[in-house]
Design a protein with these regions (language model features):
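Mature, structured extracellular domains of secreted fungal proteins
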Residues: 18-187
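Fungal secretory targeting signals
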Residues: 1-25
Length: 187
């Protein structure tokens, strides 16, 4: 009898606890996960944008830029290496029938390697500002013209597939005239 009572209590606790939580927050698990991952990804984007804005302003030394790039590669969450993790989480929340969002996921899986590779180039630049500037230009080109517009598509796809999730868009570094416009400006 004790085993049956325990089994029923366990079943009731695990079965009914989740819907109660959902009713209390008003969000489905998918909507909550979508919102959490979008917010986390926006934090990551803001950190990378901050670095790119400082690099464009020319207010830090080559050594400082190298150290900041290393931080973006090593620190998680809130860093460049966390963005692919956010991509994978949100890709699982996008409907496979959403061809636009799924194409953006595929693009980002390829493109992120270029951003991370260029951050590594900055870290290993040996305080050579020409190398750093070249790598920053390549990162800006990738982010302004491909990464940020694709992230917007992933955000839209995840939100569309998870009612209750909050719509969001990205913003680029100051050098992006308009993400996806095909141009950026770097001094």
């Amino acid at each position: 009898m004790a085993i049956k009572t325990f089994a029923f209590a366990f079943y009731a606790a695990t079965t009914f606890a989740i819907p109660l939580t959902i009713r209390q927050t008003g969000l489905s698990p998918g909507a909550a996960a979508t919102n959490d991952n979008i917010q986390g990804w926006q934090d990551d984007i803001a950190n990378v944008n901050g670095f790119l804005n400082v690099a464009a302003a020319g207010t830090e030394s080559a050594l400082q830029l190298e150290q900041t790039a290393a931080d973006l590669l090593l620190a998680q969450p809130g860093a460049a290496t966390d963005e692919p993790n956010r991509l994978m989480a949100l890709a699982g929340l996008v409907s496979s029938a959403d061809t636009t969002a799924m194409a953006a996921v595929s693009d980002l899986m390829v493109i992120f390697g270029g951003v991370l590779s260029n951050l590594t180039t900055i870290v290993n630049a040996g305080e050579d500002m020409t190398v750093i500037t070249g790598a920053v230009n390549l990162i800006n080109d990738l982010r302004c013209n491909f990464v940020l517009p694709d992230i917007d598509q992933v955000f839209a796809g995840a939100v569309a597939n998870n009612p209750g999730a909050t719509a969001a868009t990205t913003s680029g570094p100051n050098v992006c005239l308009a993400p996806g416009a095909g141009t950026f400006v770097l001094a």
